Amino acid sequence: MALKVYNSVTQSLRQVVQVDKSELWKGRPLKKLAKGITKTGGRNNLGRITIWHRGKGHKQLYRMIDFKRRVFDIYATVERIEYDPNRTAFIALIKYDDGKFSYILSPRNLNVGDKIISSDKAEINVGNCLPLEVIPVGTIIHNIEIKPGKGGQVARSAGTYAVLLNKDSGYAQIKFRSGEVRRISLASRATVGSVSNIDHKNISYGKAGRVRWLGRRPVVRGVAMNPVDHPHGGGEGKTSGGRHPVTPWGKKTKGKKTRKNKFTSRFIVKRRN
């Protein structure tokens, strides 16, 4: 997909850069694989804000994506490539030879009419889903399971991928885009190729309103608040906050490690930092 740049007809279009979606499906999603979602605005069941900077955004339908690829040994044909407002990657509607439909993450260079399959004996082609045990070393993969059978959890955003580095003692060493190298069970499955919409990183929204459509509200700096609202608030005139950066609840931020799951740390061969 190419990038789409607009002429400066208005000030809000002057900086806009979007991904050209002219080749995508222009109709509605498949009805039985889509459902409505209720926006919470970042509030919990008590009506209190638990996640800052969340708003309503535009009304959306949630597309039910098959991250597990559990229909084995049956070929599927790519019917169309679609835009999904709930994620940065594009999605593909596939039709299995037995007549069932499913949505999957669309890999890069997957085209309408292509045949894909989820099988232990599948070829190493873009869109095919296989166990890590049978994927050759050096292959680019995405939608990787951390726990066998749980469904893909890693490398699902637009343009992302991981590389299979090594296999040893029942585990595969996978290198992520962050630089982290992690051991994952050879029984876990992954899809060959990288995720579509690689130009997503080059998008420029051009105006605040376009970001509001996505459900994001403005972010206010702590030093611009009052002391009752933030540890950096208050002071006469403009101040720097007078202390090291902290969260609104006084916890150190900007560089402080927040990882809690010590049990799985043993699977990390090389940390991203």
From Swiss-Prot:
Transmembrane segments: none
GO biological process: translation
Basic residues bias (residue ranges): 251-260
Keyword Membrane among UniProt keywords: no
Region Disordered, annotated ranges: 224-260
Keyword Ribosomal protein: yes
Pfam families named among the record's database cross-references: Ribosomal_L2 (PF00181), Ribosomal_L2_C (PF03947)
GO molecular function: rRNA binding; structural constituent of ribosome; transferase activity
Keywords in alphabetical order: Ribonucleoprotein, Ribosomal protein, RNA-binding, rRNA-binding
InterPro entries in the record: NA-bd_OB-fold, Rib_uL2_dom2, Ribosomal_uL2, Ribosomal_uL2_bac/org-type, Ribosomal_uL2_C, Ribosomal_uL2_CS, Ribosomal_uL2_dom3, Ribosomal_uL2_RNA-bd_dom
GO CC terms in record: large ribosomal subunit
Record function comment: One of the primary rRNA binding proteins. Required for association of the 30S and 50S subunits to form the 70S ribosome, for tRNA binding and peptide bond formation. It has been suggested to have peptidyltransferase activity; this is somewhat controversial. Makes several contacts with the 16S rRNA in the 70S ribosome.
Quaternary structure and interacting proteins, as annotated: Part of the 50S ribosomal subunit. Forms a bridge to the 30S subunit in the 70S ribosome.
Family annotation (PANTHER family): LARGE RIBOSOMAL SUBUNIT PROTEIN UL2M, RIBOSOMAL PROTEIN L2
Family that this chain belongs to: Belongs to the universal ribosomal protein uL2 family.
Name this protein carries in UniProt: Large ribosomal subunit protein uL2
Organism in which the protein naturally occurs: Orientia tsutsugamushi (strain Ikeda)
